[in-house]
Amino acid sequence: MGGPGGMPDLNQLFGQIQAMMQPYDGPLNWDVALDTARKAVAQQPDPSPTQRQKDAVADAVRLADHWLDDTTAFPSGVTSTAAWSRAEWLVGTVEVWKVLVEPVAKQTVDSLSSALPEEARAASGPLLGIIGKAVGVMLASQVGSGLGALASEVLTASDVGLPLGAAGRAALVPANVEAFAAGLDVSTDDVLLYLALREAAHQRLFAHVPWLREHLLGAVTAYARGIEINAEAIQSRIEEQMRGVDPTDPESMQRLLEGGLFDMPKSPAQEAALLRLETTLALVEGWVDEVVGQATAERMPAAAKMQEAVRRRRAAGGPAEDTFASLVGLELRPRRLRDASTLWGSLRTRQGTEARDGVWMHPDLLPSAADLDDPLGFREDAAAPAEISESDFDAELAKLLDGDLPDGDQPGDQPGDQPGDQPGDQPGDQPGDGPTPA
């Protein structure tokens, strides 16, 4: 922050001080965050979508929903469509970002206050409140920069795998879609339709799996809150970083927040929440990848190229996702998308569409991270048994009636009995023992 000749930029300095003094609720000043995000978006042209673009999005989503009817047991979850500018994406998703960001903001403000020595807290008095407000404004500036960067890249409302928009609203960002299409050897219409298929598939899943939205957002907030965090380790880290920080100097406060404040050792609870989030994100994205692949297999020649482009984009992330990862402390990208897509496809091949989609009935039924290690083996033992001929059935029945049972089992044996046990034997009896007297 500086003006001509190395002099401070007084307008910017006074603007920061004024923002700190403005009252706001919660741990983060969202007015500052949104203002920062809008300014970041305004650095490049951001025209409002034309009526033609709005109609194109609506038509693409309508066709996408029709194609998806043949590939999933879930009915349409789309109740409205929208073509957003980048600024409109900010407005349309900010309420969910508040849910995601505020826990980590509150943790940060509280940790900074508690990191001060007891004597310093007693001597600071009202200054502690000012420090908290200053940190809230600095965090808001970082959040705004991160959201502004994301707004310049996102393609749809569900592009990061989380339900960021209103329930049932399928939204695309035409300006970003066109920029994405420019780097592919695929027509813009095909790119729009493919992305509409993905958006409509997300909407179906979130609409008809009622627990999924809270499950995903809950994993994010559980991570952000740092459940069972090592308070001593964090306090030591913050105390180390706060040495030399002048609460009256906005630049020193900014350096504190940019100096790896969020790069702290993860607690076991945070590691568990992160694994749950990454696995569920991969399962959501893998399911979308699978059903869209089915829907386009015989209808869209460019689908394979689009699928690979989207997979690479989601797996690698970009500058915007890196910015947000450094801000919140986690990455919203499905690292195991390919494994998850393979798992869903294998389950459909063996047991059918309804069995594949039925896994979403309850979170306890979802594949685990270990299941993604062997995607072809998920529920392998639940595959439909091979048909048996009438003659084979008669032969097996004859063996049973003749007492020709495998391994020396006797009629009336219970699961876990040893060969040669007598009816009524108790666990631990020796072979040949009779019933244990009462």
Description of each model-found segment:
Residues 1-33, 108-134, 384-412, 436-437:
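Long amphipathic alpha-helical segments used for membrane anchoring, targeting, substrate engagement
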Residues 1-72:
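N-terminal low-complexity, Ser/Thr- and acidic-residue-enriched intrinsically disordered segments
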Residues 58-175:
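Auxiliary, metal-adjacent structural segments of Zn-dependent hydrolase domains
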Residues 137-158, 206-258, 272-299:
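Post-HExxH zinc-binding segment in Zn-dependent metallohydrolases
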Residues 177-195:
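Short pre-active-site segment immediately N-terminal to the catalytic Zn-binding motif
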Residues 190-210, 344:
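Active-site recognition of the HExxH zinc-binding catalytic motif
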